[in-house]
Design a protein with these regions (language model features):
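Cytoplasmic-entry segments and transmembrane alpha-helices of multi-pass inner-membrane transporters
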Residues: 208-209, 220-248
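Hydrophobic alpha-helical transmembrane bundles that constitute the permease/transmembrane domains
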Residues: 215-219
Length: 248
């Protein structure tokens, strides 16, 4: 029951099979865990890059996005995140320096779509859109057409680059979560718990209880009937009438 275990799941998501019968295709929750990794360096600058590909083919915007990563570095490298959209436009999402350290450390962090730095960075690129984006969420800007605030379908490439001068640094591992409205075969609850897992955990206990109750019912009925037949006369009649009342 540790909420930390469910943070990568969406809140109150519907089952993914609903998209098979729905006229409007809702965005599925995506957890991208296998990025393309590139490393490069020249005489001064070292680069560690992770890229995530996403095929977005839905009729609504995603709920949010979360980028989780761990990096190894010293001093204060620069982390930049951008996305190349299906229309060829490249949007800069965030550019920030990681916390300074004299020694080589492993730093873990998450970047949420609600981060004020992301919203500010996207607002500086408002001239790419034909409508006002000031009041829109980050995900609604990134996944929007430039002519109207409607989902732009196609392939997206999210790139995360870690730059450091002279010293070597790298992104050890990372994943990108695109928050959707459909997840798994049973969906999730308001605490992000996968309902299918709860069903699997509860099934053995439910089967055990059902089996015990059914066997106990048969044994009780057998004993009841044998005793009524053995005693006969008024005892049998009384027990049968009592049985009729219970069944009624």
């Amino acid at each position: 029951n540790n909420p930390e275990n469910w943070i990568t799941y969406p809140k109150t998501a519907i089952p993914i099979w609903v998209n098979l019968i729905s006229m409007e295709k809702l965005p599925e929750h995506k957890i991208l865990e296998n990025p393309s990794i590139e490393k490069a360096s020249n005489n001064e600058i070292n680069l560690s890059s992770h890229q995530f590909g996403l095929n977005f083919d839905y009729d609504q915007f995603p709920n949010d996005f979360i980028y989780s990563y761990s990096s190894e570095y010293s001093e204060s490298p620069l982390l930049q995140m951008s996305v190349i959209r299906p229309d060829g436009i490249k949007l800069e999402i965030i550019s920030t320096s990681l916390p300074y350290s004299n020694l080589k450390i492993i730093h873990e962090d998450r970047i949420f779509s609600t981060d004020a730095m992301i919203k500010k960075k996207l607002s500086l690129q408002s001239d790419l859109f034909d409508f006002e984006i000031k009041k829109l969420s980050s995900e609604n800007i990134i996944f929007s057409k430039t002519t109207s605030n409607e989902p732009l379908k196609g392939n997206y490439i999210f790139s995360v680059n870690l730059y450091e001068i002279e010293n070597s640094s790298e992104i050890i591992e990372s994943n990108l979560i695109i928050g959707g409205k459909a997840f798994g075969i049973m969906g999730t609850d308001e605490l992000r718990r996968d309902l299918a897992i709860g069903l699997l955990w509860g099934t053995p206990l439910a089967l055990f209880i059902g089996l015990v109750v059914s066997i106990a019912s048969v044994i009780m009925g057998l004993v009841y009937g044998v005793y009524a037949g053995f005693k006969g006369k008024k005892t049998d009649e009384t027990l049968m009438r009592f049985n009729d009342v219970i069944y009624a």
